[in-house]
């Protein structure tokens, strides 16, 4: 893939000819300047192309993610074969048809109760639709959407800080003797599994208003094999319009309060000190607040008549931060949905929402097998280099045309304009340099360019500036910076980029913890920071480009030196090197076959250190490049590949 050209120049003495290694440059070449050497090239290309994120969900590592779902990810469901994802992806989900995390938390009568649990750095949630307005769950509340919103938000928040999570479906408890398990007409003559309803008989006509309820529950440090550092607990209580609505018999105010082991109030409602704020008439409503509690023993105190007892929780190990993806979970036509999942994710730092642009149109049935959702989830079959609210990227380029919206994780590209990305020479390359490069053998080569520039993420301007990359002194002959200087420059850039990449990723993770989608000021600040990083990276790439050009030029000159040395060795006394890369041969002493041996290697073998591609040799004259200026024309499919002799010609002048 590389070619060299030899030029023969005629001398005035008829029996002698002058043959030189020579550049062949015309107006189609462009000049590229570098640190330590320059290049002529027939083509040029950008160091990186802009990439465009793909819409939908993906993961950074196939072995470290887990999903939580329902019938749309349940392979045992009859509608699954025409559902939304591959069987391979569905295997990663903990799912049961008809289930949802909230259904398992509260356990309304007649609904699916599934033990959700699992571990993974990245958690994908595609569930929630089974608790929606279509489910028509009442139990002292006509609309559970705001509770669902707070529940899902708490789940996403804690999941983003944990490696493992699990439903704890049976808390240890102690209840007072005077209460019994209760039911409610508007709960199908039953009640929720969590909280459980306990009732106490009250006889005010006999001046017996009942006793205050005192109960205890324990949040475990471990549930099965799952460690519990923090629990999500639903603190539920009734809301009454007034004291008279709660207790028309004059037996005191309503209260339902949770205390920790030190006696501190952690949740509940106390109408002994707080006003009544209900608006439901004679029927109370039930409110459930989401509490994040550490393992331990807690007490519940309530007024007579009713006790709402926490009997379930979700436990989290809080061991590892990681991405959370929430997939919009809505019904197809004919069923009413809510958008609690969407709102919960958008208001939770670190949560990426996968959202449809069109109504859900199922293919297996009205509610399973939507084509748009299938496309949005197809990325779960692959590993991405970057995942973000804008989509996922698996290309190696560090630049994208548009700013990727946070949150984002992985090796994410920065926004840049195409015209700002530096260009490098390509196609046929010819080095130019000072006149001393073929008489002084270079000490060493420079390697590692591809490793250095492929996969760059974020870099910033370092304190040393550009000058910090040009260590060492210039050669007195004017041939550019020394090779040792260039090597140190590459090493410094590599080290700086690795350090800055690490520190920048840490900074981005901290920003993910702070950013929510409605915090415009933080979003604007993040955008400014990323724009600065993009400009810094482009500046670094400009330096790398200049060093790269110089490195290629030096490398080609070294190969040229090897070629010249081999020719001189083969010629022995038959050719006299009169200047770097030029020899005089007596045509009467060294005939055509002799010249073929010296310059064409008998058309059988190239220079031993240079792998062959084309060993044909032709000689041609180009008097414009007479003298000691040296070069080697190459094709640059691989910038650091070895050279091959090709295209040497002899021109005689008597």
From Swiss-Prot:
Cytoplasmic topology ranges: 651-654
Predominant location: virion
GO cellular component: host cell plasma membrane; membrane; viral envelope; virion membrane
Topology in the lipid bilayer: Single-pass type I membrane protein
Fusion domain-1: annotated span: 15-40
InterPro entries hit by this protein: Capsid_hemagglutn, Hemagglutn-estrase_core, Hemagglutn-estrase_hemagglutn, Hemagglutn_influenz_A/B, Hemagglutn_stalk_influenz-C
SUPFAM superfamilies in alphabetical order: Influenza hemagglutinin (stalk), SGNH hydrolase, Viral protein domain
Transmembrane segment boundaries: 630-650
Keyword Glycoprotein assigned: yes
Residue segments, region Fusion domain-2: 364-654
UniProt region (Esterase domain-2), positions on chain: 309-363
Catalytic activity: N-acetyl-9-O-acetylneuraminate + H2O = N-acetylneuraminate + acetate + H(+); N-acetyl-4-O-acetylneuraminate + H2O = N-acetylneuraminate + acetate + H(+)
Pfam families, A to Z: Hema_esterase, Hema_HEFG, Hema_stalk
Sugar-bearing residue positions: 26, 61, 143, 188, 394, 551, 602
Sorted UniProt keywords: Disulfide bond, Fusion of virus membrane with host endosomal membrane, Fusion of virus membrane with host membrane, Glycoprotein, Hemagglutinin, Host cell membrane, Host membrane, Host-virus interaction, Hydrolase, Membrane, Signal, Transmembrane, Transmembrane helix, Viral attachment to host cell, Viral envelope protein, Viral penetration into host cytoplasm, Virion, Virus endocytosis by host, Virus entry into host cell
Extracellular side: 15-629
Signal peptide start-end: 1-14
Subcellular location: Virion membrane; Host cell membrane
Gene Ontology MF terms in the entry: host cell surface receptor binding; sialate 4-O-acetylesterase activity; sialate 9-O-acetylesterase activity
The keyword Nucleotide-binding appears for this protein: no
Subunit structure, interactors included: Homotrimer of disulfide-linked HEF1-HEF2.
Main function: Binds to the N-acetyl-9-O-acetylneuraminic acid residues on the cell surface, bringing about the attachment of the virus particle to the cell. Plays a major role in the determination of host range restriction and virulence. Class I viral fusion protein. Responsible for penetration of the virus into the cell cytoplasm by mediating the fusion of the membrane of the endocytosed virus particle with the endosomal membrane. Low pH in endosomes induce an irreversible conformational change in HEF2, releasing the fusion hydrophobic peptide. Several trimers are required to form a competent fusion pore.
Protein name: Hemagglutinin-esterase-fusion glycoprotein
Native source species: Influenza C virus (strain C/California/1978)
